Amino acid sequence: GRCCDVPNACSGRWCRDHAQCC
């Protein structure tokens, strides 16, 4: 998914908000 292409996508707030993409 697109959010997984973001730097550090699977850490911090981004991961909590988009956990389904990690």
UniProtKB/Swiss-Prot annotation:
It is found in: Secreted. Expressed by the venom duct. Has not been isolated from the crude venom. The keyword Secreted applies. Coiled coil: none annotated. GO terms for cellular component: extracellular region. Disulfide bonds join 3-15, 4-21, 10-22. Keywords: Amidation, Disulfide bond, Ion channel impairing toxin, Neurotoxin, Secreted, Toxin, Voltage-gated sodium channel impairing toxin. The keyword Electron transport does not apply. The modification Cysteine amide is found at residue 22. One of its GO terms (molecular function) is toxin activity. Mu-conotoxins block voltage-gated sodium channels (Nav). This synthetic toxin moderately blocks rNav1.1/SCN1A, rNav1.2/SCN2A, rNav1.3/SCN3A, rNav1.4/SCN4A, rNav1.5/SCN5A, and mNav1.6/SCN8A. This block is very slowly reversible. Causes seizures when injected intracranially into mice. The cysteine framework is III (CC-C-C-CC). Negative results: does not inhibit Nav1.7/SCN9A and Nav1.8/SCN10A. Belongs to the conotoxin M superfamily. This is Mu-conotoxin CnIIIA. The lineage of its organism: Eukaryota, Metazoa, Spiralia, Lophotrochozoa, Mollusca.
